[in-house]
Amino acid sequence: MIREERLLKVILAPHISEKSTVVAEKTNTVVFRVAIDATKSEIKAAVEKLFEVEVAGVRTLINKGKTKRHGARVGRRSDWKKAYVTLAAGADIDFVGAEA
């Protein structure tokens, strides 16, 4: 079993983009920005615990940081990890959470 404090550090934020919105509508998949060292099993456990939904599958990828310039200096942004979490049929995550 994964410790609860680790589960809280795995998911950093939902990743909102045009592609993630299209994927969410078509395939019941939610996209998260996750810790770079997070495993698929940790991501699955964290989503199931935090959002109380059943997860059908997890796919991950690492985005390489871009090279940026500030005058003559060249720097590089950090690499980051993205997770596509497919939810079980009938499950849904509401990020707004506003109940009237």
UniProtKB/Swiss-Prot annotation:
Pfam families: Ribosomal_L23. GO terms for molecular function: rRNA binding; structural constituent of ribosome. The keyword Electron transport does not apply. One of the early assembly proteins it binds 23S rRNA. One of the proteins that surrounds the polypeptide exit tunnel on the outside of the ribosome. Forms the main docking site for trigger factor binding to the ribosome. This is Large ribosomal subunit protein uL23. The gene is rplW. InterPro entries: Nucleotide-bd_a/b_plait_sf, Ribosomal_uL23-like, Ribosomal_uL23/eL15/eS24_sf, Ribosomal_uL23_CS. One of its GO terms (cellular component) is ribonucleoprotein complex. It comes from the Bacteria. Keywords: Ribonucleoprotein, Ribosomal protein, RNA-binding, rRNA-binding. One of its GO terms (biological process) is translation. Belongs to the universal ribosomal protein uL23 family. Part of the 50S ribosomal subunit. Contacts protein L29, and trigger factor when it is bound to the ribosome.
